From Swiss-Prot:
Belongs to the bacterial ribosomal protein bL33 family. It comes from Streptococcus pneumoniae serotype 4 (strain ATCC BAA-334 / TIGR4). The gene is rpmG1. This is Large ribosomal subunit protein bL33A. HAMAP family: Ribosomal_bL33. InterPro entries: Ribosomal_bL33, Ribosomal_bL33_CS, Ribosomal_bL33_sf, Ribosomal_zn-bd.
Length: 49
């Protein structure tokens, strides 16, 4: 079953992206390097609900 998750910037705390994941195949939290428009650089984004 796919669930919707938010990706939150680890340095500034803003929620920049909305995505989905399959919780059965990937039960752990997602960590992705994405662009943060508030800081104007690529930062680590963590899964938040």
């Amino acid at each position: 079953m796919r669930v919707k998750i938010n990706l939150k910037c680890s340095s500034c705390g803003s929620i920049n992206y909305l995505t989905s994941k399959n919780s059965k195949t990937h039960p752990d939290k997602i960590e992705v390097l994405k662009y943060c428009p508030k800081e104007r650089k690529v930062t680590l984004h963590l899964e938040s609900k």
